[in-house]
Regions:
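Cytosolic juxtamembrane helix and N-cap/initiation of the first transmembrane helix
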Residues: 17-49
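Membrane-water interface at the C-terminal end of transmembrane alpha helices
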Residues: 150-164
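Membrane-helix boundary connector in multi-pass membrane proteins
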Residues: 127-144
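Cytoplasmic juxtamembrane regions at transmembrane-helix boundaries
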Residues: 99-120
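Membrane-helix boundary elements
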Residues: 41-82
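Membrane-interface helix-boundary signature
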Residues: 23-34, 74-84, 111-115, 137, ...
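Hydrophobic alpha-helical transmembrane segments of polytopic
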Residues: 30-40, 88, 117-125, 144
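Alpha-helical transmembrane segments of helical membrane proteins, especially in multi-pass transport
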Residues: 84-102
Length: 164
């Protein structure tokens, strides 16, 4: 399965990517930045799964400026909110893990497809999530999104020569 997945990802690489010299690879600083940011996404996702009460209090503080508001919604509603947080967390664990491996293998090797995979996935998450947050009046989540976006935007900008 892993070999098959690597072959699929490898098809994104162009002949130009294969001919890149080691000098055209991103610096270790930026690769490490991507790795830490990706691990942070996965860790945050895991926190959403394993610490439901902490997660509810955190999002309650973020949205309502009070740690107990979400828990006052009623038992069934709180259970459902915890489920949604856990599902979101699981997706974030998967996405963060994938980003980590793309950065460690493709991007670190100077393969431009690695840069594009990271950039496209971050933008594909950021735009709809942030747009809905703003349209629904939850600007606080948009601010949280902006912080996560910046974790990837900075090294993407620094390594933008690899995007071709």
């Amino acid at each position: 399965m892993v070999a098959h997945s690597a072959a699929i990802i490898g098809t994104f690489a162009t002949q130009r990517d294969a001919a890149m010299t080691p000098g055209s690879r991103p610096s270790k600083f930026w690769i490490n930045w991507f790795l830490v940011a990706s691990a942070g996404v996965a860790a945050f996702g895991l926190l959403l799964v394993v610490a439901p009460a902490f997660t509810r209090r955190g999002f309650s503080m973020l949205v309502y400026a009070s740690p107990g508001d979400i828990d006052s919604f009623g038992a069934e509603q709180v259970r459902y909110i915890s489920l949604v947080h856990a599902v979101l967390g699981g997706v974030m664990v998967g996405w963060g893990t994938a980003l980590f491996h793309v950065a460690r293998s493709l991007l670190a090797g100077g393969v431009s497809a690695g840069w594009r995979i990271i950039a496209v996935s971050v933008v594909a998450w950021f735009v709809p999530d942030t747009a809905y947050s703003l349209l629904s009046g939850f600007w606080q989540n948009a601010l949280l999104n902006a912080a996560f976006f910046a974790l990837f935007a900075v090294p993407l900008w620094a390594t933008r020569d690899l995007r071709r």
